[in-house]
Regions:
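Surface-exposed loop/turn motifs in large extracellular/passenger domains
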Residues: 1-21, 30-100, 104-128, 135-199
Length: 199
């Protein structure tokens, strides 16, 4: 895990980095709530910039049914996302959350109100975990504002995951706000109050 909560991180050059395995927090970003300790959640208010010819693979591998719903890149479970993630240059990024969090964005039960910018010639694949968007918010989160921008010659593959609501199925968006829980675990879409721009 590369821990970034309120600081600034730049990954540049022409090397590659693989981050895998289970962690309570994001593989790159802020810490997440731990079901073992009952604490640990942390907001992401800083910035992450992935650029040049860097290749990044960030995968949160499934641990157990009480696993935390952190993003692969962004905020951990119960952590709000008000920072900025920029991926540009010729960077190649694969972000896979696997469980209740987005590939890139705000973890489970947090709030998305930051900025994700993908541009240049970047190539990005972002896969959401259970009931989560590929890019955006995790399960049972809010999306109160902020932006997601995809521009220039960048190529983005975003994959939302099916929900696990009782007796129903709920498909979540590739980009945007994820499924919102209710007392009966029937699917309900969270309000999407931010802006998505693809040019």
């Amino acid at each position: 895990m590369i821990h970034v909560s309120d600081g600034d991180l730049t990954l540049r050059g022409d090397g590659s980095l693989t981050l895998s395995g289970w962690t309570d927090g994001a593989k790159i970003g802020s810490n997440g709530y731990s079901s073992d300790t009952g604490q640990g959640e942390e907001d992401f208010t800083g910035s992450i910039h992935i650029t040049d010819d860097v290749t990044i693979s960030a995968t949160r591998e499934y641990y157990n049914p009480s696993d935390t719903g952190s993003a692969a890149i962004g905020s951990g479970e119960k952590g709000n996302f008000t920072g900025t993630i920029t991926i540009d240059g010729n960077a190649k990024v694969n972000a896979d959350a696997t469980w209740c969090g987005p590939g890139i964005g705000c973890g489970e039960k947090g709030d998305y109100n930051g900025d994700i910018i993908i541009g240049g010639n970047a190539e990005v694949t972002a896969s959401g975990g259970s009931a989560s968007a590929g890019i955006g918010s995790g399960w049972d989160s809010t999306f109160s504002g902020g932006t997601i921008t995809i521009k220039d010659n960048s190529k983005v593959t975003a994959i939302g995951s099916n929900g696990f609501s009782q007796n129903t199925s709920c498909s979540n968006p590739a980009i945007g706000a994820s499924e919102k829980a209710n007392p009966d675990y029937n699917p309900a879409k969270a309000p999407m109050n931010g802006t998505i721009t693809i040019t």
